[in-house]
Amino acid sequence: MLTSMVKEHHKEQAKRKQEQEVRRKEAIEASNELTQSLVDTLNVGVAQAYLNQKRLDAEAKQLHLGATNFAKQTHQWLQLIDQFSTALKDLGDVENWARSIEGDMHTINQTLELAYKASRATQTSSGAGTSLEASTSASASANPSAT
């Protein structure tokens, strides 16, 4: 009876040991599955973050290129505006010069008219007809707008 009890006890221990081993293997397998699932979940997040970062880098590069092109275009526009401003200033200078010349021409014209009238008045009072024609033609050739 004692030997049968010892055998039965060893049998029970072996059975429990076997069940523990099965449970340990199941626990290890479940732990591995959980770990793999967590790694996969984290990898998806990391992969998404990596893709987002690549996209952000590409967009930042495009934005930088756009800003650089905009700065170049703005600089060109500023140069054109400066050139236009200089051209307008030059036109204003030419206009002032033309007005000055026009005023001088009016003064010269008035002076020539007065000189012509004075010479004509002197000639009519002296009565020289031939010299009058000569002075008239000389005045007319000197001042074509007076005739």
From Swiss-Prot:
Disulfide bonds: none
UniProt cross-references to InterPro entries, sorted A to Z: BLOC1S1
Any one GO biological process: olfactory learning
GO cellular component: BLOC-1 complex; neuromuscular junction; presynapse
Pfam families: GCN5L1 (PF06320)
Phenotypic effect of disruption: Show reduced eye pigmentation.
Region: Disordered, residue numbers: 1-25, 125-147
Signal peptide from the UniProt entry: none
Highest taxon, organism lineage: Eukaryota
Function: Component of the biogenesis of lysosome-related organelles complex-1 (BLOC-1) involved in pigment granule biogenesis and membrane trafficking in synapses. In response to high synaptic activity at neuromuscular junctions, stabilizes Pldn protein levels and, together with Pldn, plays a role in promoting efficient synaptic vesicle recycling and re-formation through early endosomes.
PANTHER family on file: BIOGENESIS OF LYSOSOME-RELATED ORGANELLES COMPLEX 1 SUBUNIT 1 (PTHR13073:SF0), BLOC-1 COMPLEX SUBUNIT 1 (PTHR13073)
Protein name: Biogenesis of lysosome-related organelles complex 1 subunit 1
Organism per entry: Drosophila melanogaster (Fruit fly)
Lineage start: Eukaryota, Metazoa, Ecdysozoa, Arthropoda, Hexapoda
Gene name of the encoded protein: Blos1
